[in-house]
Amino acid sequence: MHIKSIHLDGFKSYQKHTDILDFSPTFNAITGYNGSGKSNILDSICFIMGINKLDNIRAKSMHELISHGGTKAIVQVRFDNTDKRCSPFGMEHLDEIVVQRIITAQATGKGCATSYTLNGHAATNGKMQDFFRGVGLNVNNPHFLIMQGRITTVLNMKPEEILGMVEEAAGTKMYDQKKKDAEKTMFLKDAKLKEVDRIFQSSIDPRMVKFREDRKNMVEVTRLKKLKENFSRKYEAFQYFQTCEAVKKSAKEIEDAKKGIEDLGEKFNQLDLDLKNKEDEKKKMEESRDDQHEEAALSAAHLSKQSIMLQKETVKNQLVETINKLKKEGEQINKSLSKDREVLDAKRKEHEDSKAANSKDIQSQSDDEALVTKYRNDLESLTRGTIANDKGEHVSIESEIQSCKSTASQMSSGITAAKKRGERLHNQIKHLEGEKATLSARSKSDIGSADNYQKEVDEINKQLQLLGFNIDADTEKREHAAKLHESITKLKDMDTRLLNSYKDGRYALNYQRPPLHIDKFDEKRDVFGYVAHLIKMKPGCEQFAVAADIALGGVLGNVVVSTQDIARILIDGKAFTSRKTMIPVSENARNASSYNTLPDVKLRRAKEIAEKYNDTVTKMIDLIEYPDFISNTILNAVGQILVVDSLDVAREIAYDEVAKTRMITRRGDDVRTNGIMTGGYNDPGNKPALIALEPMYARRPQIEAQQRELDALNRELQLTEASSQKCRDLNNQLATAMRKLAQVKTNINNSEFGIVVRDLKVHSEEYEKNQAEIEATVKTLKDVEDKIKTLESMKNKDKNSQEKRKKELTALLQKAEQTVAQNKNRGEKARREVMLLQATVEEMEKTIKKDEGIWEQKKKECDELEEKLPNAIAALKDAELEQKAAQAKLNDLKNNQRQISTRLGKIAKECDALIREKAKTKSKREEKEKELTSLQQSEASNRKEARSKLKKFEWLSDEEAHFNKKGGLYDFEGYTVSKGKDEIKELTDKIETLERSCCIQNVSNLDTCEAKVLDIKNKRERITEDFNMLKKTIATLDKKKVDELIRAHESVNKDFGQIFNCLLPDAHASLVPPEGKTVCEGLEVKVSFGGVVKDSLHELSGGQRSLVALSLILAMLKFKPAPLYILDEVDAALDLSHTANIGMMIKTHFHHNQFIIVSLKQGMFSNADVLFQTRFADGHSTCTRLNGGDIAVLCQDKVLQAQALELTDAGKAKKDAAAKKGAQKNDKEPPKKKPIVVDDDDFE
């Protein structure tokens, strides 16, 4: 690829459009006067290749590249691409490549805008630089470009700079640049990766954690919402179930109420009957109470006995006063008593004899008086002509006969009417029996069903009797069990409310049943609750509650479970919402330790210290009560803690060498042996846990007792469950059978057959009753007729017989009266005699008894004086017993009367109670009727509510079969409306809390974010892998660079020596590393003439140095040929012969490369294939291609020769000055590396 033409417009001195055409593919020369624009053509080539260092094209800014007065500069270069061997990558199909660059001036202060086009398409600076680099034309580090002054620069180069030229020739310079760019990019990428890591750690990872927590919370919200929906369904189902149960209960209560009303009516009638019976009993007892005769007799006897007792007491007192007199009188009384006893015996015998002798007379007098009374009544009846009727009244015989005849007539009429009625009933019965026979065939099926149902009822009753199960007692037990369960639930609810209200539910045991190992877990058996639920203060120790609260501390919040397995199940199942410490009861024995109790030595020392301050020491373990299964745990917690009143005492004991133990004051100050003290308890409004939970402890025995009773009932019910179920089934069957039987009987009774049977039964009963009345009336009529006959016979007797009977009765009466008169005196005398003797005997008995009592009393009084009168006391006691006996009889009578009065009072009260009960029963019946109305309304309301629920929640009908099924979703055991509300509210609160804490957008974006984060991490890993691979590649390329550099040095050094020897025979030049260094650290030029090596290039002449520099440059060009070489007046310091030699060498050795050389010397451009001449006229430059004649004329141009000579001299002088300046600088300063300037465009 070589330049075919150049087109300039507004670039530097080429103000007008200029076309430079037909460049040679090999040697091109440009000549012209000084200032005519030769170098500007070369600058335009550098400019289009994208040079960044404007100093190399003699400009400070882009504005200076635009012609004076212009606003835009255009440079277009056409390349010939017919040689495909060196064609740029991807452009092998093009024969011509056009590159154009435009500079446009912008507003003041905004610089210039530049743009590229490649084959008519816009391109970037980086793309164009890569395009030229691809063919070996790196304008920013060029080895193909030798501008004015480059020879001098090469001569003054340091070893490092010469090495850089070799590197550029070898191609490693671009690698170094790319390496630096890559290292810079790697540095930036590494910083970016670190920044990404930092962002991940500080922002993205926490945010992703938050996103995942939000997703977890959202999953939990979804689960809780589902659970809430289930709870809501259960709540609604429970209400619907309760409503349905209430309907059933209301129906039963309505039946009970109706039955109750009937029972109350019967009770009301029974009370009325009882009230009448009580009033009759009351009347009889009042008559008995009013009899006073017996009371008077017993009262007199009691007074007599009491008088005797008083007399004996008087005798006793007299004996005490005069003991000697009593002894003498006692002897006289003893003698008198002997005589009196003899007389008494005689009188008794006389009294018995008198009774035997006079008893006949007394009885005879009584019989005679009765006979006189009888005769008088019979005579009176006979005289009047009357008889005694059934009522005992005296009526005439005639009136009695008429009364009997009237009665007989009425009876005969009644018998006739009854017979007619009987005949009529008999005819009706026969007619009904015919109808019954006719209709029985029609009702045969109903009658058979009734018989079958009756047999079924009888069979079921027989089975119930054989079963012998008391269903009423079983029902009472079940009702009692339900009441116990309800009571336990209420008590536990009270405990739950108490625990939830104390310190925001700190000791409320709320946990979820573990989803795993359900068969191994029993809540009642395996979870005992918090330690705070199991311990309490001993009675009378409540003032130490604050100290106990401080001592136990966190132990109160530990959960007591049965075994380690249960603790592991609860922990693995995440049953609690926060971390909990488990205390397995099975490990209680392992918690025992010899260090959990306070040694006696310490306790004695503590008491000694406390006594000095009049304080008392109490062991904390003695203040609390706790169950044995956590004893070692409690001992480990408070076994060595003592309680005192004073903080000073607590400190002294805690810090004492002997007593040294933990101390707590009553108000809560905690003093430890290590010097840590915790302040007192200063919030009186906040009760200690053991005081606040005291109501729960008080209710626990009641709960346990009721639970034991409930368990016993449940066990008993479970044992009888089979019988109970069988009995209930039989009762249900019996009720069904009876209902069917009643239905069949109702059908039969309502049918024609039933009506006929019912009428037949009524008529038959009436007929039988009528026949019985006829028989009774006939019998009574016969008796009446017999009585009439007797009365008529009595009426028809003659008067003579009556008179004779009257005389007989008169005589008998007179005789009886005479007998009574005769025997009256004798009987009265006998009676008086017996009574007098009886009175005498009684009086003597009394006297004897009195004397005996006196004698005994006196004797007892004497003995009492001698032996404290024991006999007198005994006699007095006897008298008292007699008095008490009499008093007892009187009291019995009075008690009897009082009992009667009490009984009357009770009867009166019972009557009042019956009256009240009657009124109460009436009131109850009215209340029952009102209750019945209310129940009916309640039933209707419940039915309406149930229908409303069913209409609102249609799923209830589908799920109703699962209601109250144990273990199912709708298990209502222990379930209440308040519990359901609490569960729903708790779930709602949890859902709201979780929804507030999580962002739905985060959850929806989580998958995208995770994918992006994963993609970023994968890219980072790939970048990291590429980064490491790049490092390895750089290390490999560094090694290859050294190898390539050595190879390039050898090749360049060989060509350098040959070219320099060719230009300057008998001279040799070489590139060698400085002393003590390697090729990779720097190179310097060594020249020898005739085998003599020059120590420095300063020893050479200016021309020789120029030849050295040119030889080196040409050696570089030969090592790595480029498609294009640009040389700007490189022959300035050479004479014509050397210039011609260089031109000939270029033409001979570089015939595959295109050279564009600016020169003023004939020796150079005479060897060129194409020569261009520049001119400057009218303020702008032009360039023309010269033919053969023009070249001959140009060779004779004196001005051009003069300028070339001036240039040669100036060049030599400039080289000498630069050489001297460089030598001085090298002597004063060590060589420095040339700074590397990297433009931002390299990274696009």
Curated annotation (Swiss-Prot):
<dbReference type="GO" id="GO:0005524">
    <property type="term" value="F:ATP binding"/>
</dbReference>
<dbReference type="InterPro" id="IPR010935">
    <property type="entry name" value="SMC_hinge"/>
</dbReference>
<dbReference type="Pfam" id="PF06470">
    <property type="entry name" value="SMC_hinge"/>
</dbReference>
<comment type="function">
    <text>Essential protein required for both chromosome condensation and segregation and X-chromosome dosage compensation depending on its binding partners. Central component of the condensin I complex, a complex required for conversion of interphase chromatin into mitotic-like condense chromosomes. The condensin complex introduces positive supercoils into relaxed DNA in the presence of type I topoisomerases. Converts nicked DNA into positive knotted forms in the presence of type II topoisomerases.</text>
</comment>
<feature type="coiled-coil region">
    <location>
        <begin position="415"/>
        <end position="472"/>
    </location>
</feature>
<dbReference type="GO" id="GO:0010629">
    <property type="term" value="P:negative regulation of gene expression"/>
</dbReference>
<feature type="compositionally biased region" description="Basic and acidic residues">
    <location>
        <begin position="1216"/>
        <end position="1232"/>
    </location>
</feature>
<dbReference type="GO" id="GO:0000796">
    <property type="term" value="C:condensin complex"/>
</dbReference>
<feature type="compositionally biased region" description="Basic and acidic residues">
    <location>
        <begin position="919"/>
        <end position="932"/>
    </location>
</feature>
<dbReference type="GO" id="GO:0051301">
    <property type="term" value="P:cell division"/>
</dbReference>
<dbReference type="InterPro" id="IPR036277">
    <property type="entry name" value="SMC_hinge_sf"/>
</dbReference>
<dbReference type="GO" id="GO:0110039">
    <property type="term" value="P:positive regulation of nematode male tail tip morphogenesis"/>
</dbReference>
<keyword id="KW-0226">DNA condensation</keyword>
<dbReference type="GO" id="GO:0016887">
    <property type="term" value="F:ATP hydrolysis activity"/>
</dbReference>
<keyword id="KW-0547">Nucleotide-binding</keyword>
<feature type="compositionally biased region" description="Basic and acidic residues">
    <location>
        <begin position="337"/>
        <end position="355"/>
    </location>
</feature>
<dbReference type="GO" id="GO:0009792">
    <property type="term" value="P:embryo development ending in birth or egg hatching"/>
</dbReference>
<feature type="coiled-coil region">
    <location>
        <begin position="701"/>
        <end position="946"/>
    </location>
</feature>
<feature type="region of interest" description="Disordered">
    <location>
        <begin position="1216"/>
        <end position="1244"/>
    </location>
</feature>
<keyword id="KW-0131">Cell cycle</keyword>
<dbReference type="InterPro" id="IPR024704">
    <property type="entry name" value="SMC"/>
</dbReference>
<dbReference type="GO" id="GO:0042464">
    <property type="term" value="P:dosage compensation by hypoactivation of X chromosome"/>
</dbReference>
<dbReference type="GO" id="GO:0045132">
    <property type="term" value="P:meiotic chromosome segregation"/>
</dbReference>
<comment type="subunit">
    <text>Component of the condensin I complex, which contains the mix-1/SMC2 and smc-4/SMC4 heterodimer, and three non SMC subunits that probably regulate the complex: dpy-26, capg-1 and dpy-28. Within the complex, interacts with smc-4, dpy-26, dpy-28 and capg-1. Interaction with smc-4 is required for mitotic chromosome localization. Component of the condensin II complex, which contains the mix-1/SMC2 and smc-4/SMC4 heterodimer, and three non SMC subunits, capg-2, kle-2 and hcp-6 that probably regulate the complex. Within the complex, interacts with smc-4, capg-2, kle-2 and hcp-6.</text>
</comment>
<keyword id="KW-0498">Mitosis</keyword>
<protein>
    <recommendedName>
        <fullName>Mitotic chromosome and X-chromosome-associated protein mix-1</fullName>
    </recommendedName>
</protein>
<keyword id="KW-0158">Chromosome</keyword>
<feature type="domain" description="SMC hinge">
    <location>
        <begin position="526"/>
        <end position="654"/>
    </location>
</feature>
<feature type="compositionally biased region" description="Polar residues">
    <location>
        <begin position="356"/>
        <end position="365"/>
    </location>
</feature>
<dbReference type="InterPro" id="IPR003395">
    <property type="entry name" value="RecF/RecN/SMC_N"/>
</dbReference>
<dbReference type="Pfam" id="PF02463">
    <property type="entry name" value="SMC_N"/>
</dbReference>
<dbReference type="InterPro" id="IPR027417">
    <property type="entry name" value="P-loop_NTPase"/>
</dbReference>
<dbReference type="GO" id="GO:0000805">
    <property type="term" value="C:X chromosome"/>
</dbReference>
<dbReference type="InterPro" id="IPR027120">
    <property type="entry name" value="Smc2_ABC"/>
</dbReference>
<feature type="coiled-coil region">
    <location>
        <begin position="247"/>
        <end position="355"/>
    </location>
</feature>
<dbReference type="GO" id="GO:0007076">
    <property type="term" value="P:mitotic chromosome condensation"/>
</dbReference>
<keyword id="KW-0469">Meiosis</keyword>
<comment type="similarity">
    <text>Belongs to the SMC family. SMC2 subfamily.</text>
</comment>
<keyword id="KW-0132">Cell division</keyword>
<dbReference type="GO" id="GO:0000775">
    <property type="term" value="C:chromosome, centromeric region"/>
</dbReference>
<dbReference type="GO" id="GO:0000793">
    <property type="term" value="C:condensed chromosome"/>
</dbReference>
<keyword id="KW-0067">ATP-binding</keyword>
